[in-house]
From Swiss-Prot:
Species this chain originates from: Homo sapiens (Human)
Gene: MKRN1
Disulfide bonds: none
Tissue specificity field: Ubiquitous.
GO cellular component: cytosol
Catalytic activity: S-ubiquitinyl-[E2 ubiquitin-conjugating enzyme]-L-cysteine + [acceptor protein]-L-lysine = [E2 ubiquitin-conjugating enzyme]-L-cysteine + N(6)-ubiquitinyl-[acceptor protein]-L-lysine
GO annotation (BP), single: protein ubiquitination
Name of this protein: E3 ubiquitin-protein ligase makorin-1
The protein's assembly and partners: Interacts with p53/TP53 and CDKN1A. Interacts with TERT, modulating telomere length homeostasis.
Zn-finger region bounds: C3H1-type: 55-82, 84-111, 208-235, 364-393
Entry-linked InterPro entries: MKRN-like, MKRN1_C, Znf-CCCH_4, Znf_C3HC4_RING-type, Znf_CCCH, Znf_CCCH_sf, Znf_RING, Znf_RING/FYVE/PHD
Keyword presence, Transferase: yes
Gly residues bias: start-end ranges: 40-52
Function: E3 ubiquitin ligase catalyzing the covalent attachment of ubiquitin moieties onto substrate proteins. These substrates include FILIP1, p53/TP53, CDKN1A and TERT. Keeps cells alive by suppressing p53/TP53 under normal conditions, but stimulates apoptosis by repressing CDKN1A under stress conditions. Acts as a negative regulator of telomerase. Has negative and positive effects on RNA polymerase II-dependent transcription.
CDD domains reported in the protein's UniProt record: RING-HC_MKRN1_3
Length: 482
């Protein structure tokens, strides 16, 4: 029954509030329904009311349950969680890793076994109902042996989570069919067989790895030492590295051969440097290897002479225009004519080495485009005897021009008659009226006539030195720069 209002006061309790108070007085257990607080009450209830708390002390404070009640001891609701059937259990504590410990605002208690059994029973019933409904819809697709299922369940109960032999569970191997612990027909023989196979493969791989030379020991030192999985080879007497395979004779002989070749090249280079470091240029009188500019530390090797010149000085000497061709093409010391100058980083004096250098120089020149041929747009006066490359823009090489049958002899006869005319003109003219060009023309014709006479009527001479000299004279006469 609702409590009467005291005299002099106004009853402010609404109808819903009176009904809730009546239900609270009639029932020994309070209903967890919180009425709307009055305007004067705070979020957690305000101060104590005039009736000393009343039924509100039997209701647990929802803010205190979450640890955020700011009223403290003045709260009109109960702060006793032991009597509350609606306590919030910490889900992290149930999982076993709550980081707050005793300071956690939620209850740290494990669920009762009766509750676990009830939850398990409900889960089982729901799963059975779902499976029965599914089987009724889909139909009898798979027949199951009830006795076998029960035996498996009993075996599962025997070797469940509480069993002590759970550490002996069968290991899952990728690529192999997995056999569960509950299957009595599953044996460990296939697993052991697979493991044995894997171990044999690993052993075979280890053996193959042991046959390979260690790349670190081959170039220096291996930090693993004797524990290295690779093979450390024998030391080579030439290079001092552990690169000789103990069981591969072919590899040992091949490496020793390559080491000897590399050693010979190094020795040749050392000898070349030794004989070149003190050579003095015959024009500037400086040691070639001691020039201030490193790009000028190169020799200009004359093809027919063994005198020493730096490349810069001999090229400058041979490019002079105020002297005759024989003077600038000859050696400044011995006056022997050399057809061309070969640039070289080392001094070369022996005939065989000089021939190798000349062949190497001509091979290098054959890879450079001839500026007179100009990719087919111009004409080179030396034709197929030119040192430089005659190639078209698409990469095709110039094919040597073939002369028709009988034209070669007729052409040589015409040239011979032409030079005889030059000689006759030379003899009949006044020698004091001849200028330098006519003298050069006469010398050039006389030299070519000698070449034709030496070769006979059928063939020309194949002397490269004579033809090179002829090229130089022709170059100077026609003001060419080849």
């Amino acid at each position: 029954m609702a409590e009467a209002a005291t005299p002099g006061t106004t009853a402010t309790t609404s109808g819903a509030g009176a009904a809730a108070a009546t239900a609270a007085a009639a029932s020994p257990t309070p209903i967890p329904t919180v009425t709307a607080p009055s305007l004067g009450a705070g979020g957690g209830g305000g101060g104590s009311d005039g009736s000393g708390g009343g039924w509100t002390k039997q209701v647990t404070c929802r803010y205190f349950m979450h640890g955020v009640c700011k009223e403290g001891d003045n709260c009109r609701y109960s702060h006793d969680l032991s009597d509350s059937p609606y306590s919030v259990v910490c889900k992290y504590f149930q999982r076993g890793y709550c980081i707050y410990g005793d300071r956690c605002r939620y209850e740290h208690s494990k669920p009762l076994k009766q509750e676990e059994a009830t939850a398990t029973e409900l889960t089982t019933k729901s799963s059975l109902a779902a499976s029965s409904s599914l089987s009724s819809i889909v139909g009898p697709l798979v027949e199951m042996n009830t006795g076998e299922a029960e035996s498996r369940n009993s075996n599962f109960a025997t070797v469940g989570a509480g069993s002590e032999d759970w550490v002996n569970a069968i290991e899952f191997v990728p690529g192999q069919p997995y056999c569960g612990r509950t299957a009595p027909s599953c044996t460990e023989a296939p697993l052991q067989g697979s493991v044995t196979k894997e171990e044999s493969e690993k052993e075979q791989t280890a053996v193959e790895t042991k046959k390979q030379l260690c790349p670190y020991a081959a170039v220096g030192e291996c930090r693993y030492g004797e524990n290295c999985v690779y093979l450390h080879g024998d030391s080579c007497d030439m290079c001092g590295l552990q690169v000789l395979h103990p069981m591969d004779a072919a590899q040992r002989s091949q490496h020793i051969k390559s080491c000897i070749e590399a050693h010979e090249k190094d020795m040749e280079l050392s000898f070349a440097v030794q004989r070149s470091k003190d050579m003095v240029c015959g024009i500037c009188m400086e040691v070639v290897y001691e020039k201030a500019n490193p790009s000028e530390r190169r020799f200009g090797i004359l093809s027919n002479c063994n005198h020493t010149y730096c490349l810069k000085c001999i090229r400058k000497w041979r490019s002079a225009k105020q002297f005759e061709s024989k003077i600038i093409k000859s050696c400044p010391e011995c006056r022997i004519t050399s057809n061309f100058v070969i640039p070289s980083e080392y001094w070369v004096e022996e005939k065989e080495e000089k021939q190798k250098l000349i062949l190497k120089y001509k091979e290098a020149m054959s890879n450079k485009a001839c500026r007179y041929f100009d990719e087919g747009r111009g004409s080179c006066p030396f034709g197929g005897n030119c040192f430089y490359k005659h190639a078209y823009p698409d990469g095709r090489r110039e094919e040597p021009q073939r002369q028709k049958v009988g034209t070669s002899s007729r052409y040589r006869a015409q040239r011979r008659n032409h030079f005889w005319e030059l000689i006759e003109e030379r003899e009949n003219s006044n020698p004091f009226d001849n200028d330098e060009e006519e003298v050069v023309t006469f010398e050039l014709g006389e030299m070519l006539l000698m070449l034709l006479a030496a070769g006979g009527d059928d063939e020309l001479t194949d002397s490269e030195d004579e033809w090179d000299l002829f090229h130089d004279e022709l170059e100077d006469f026609y003001d060419l720069d080849l």
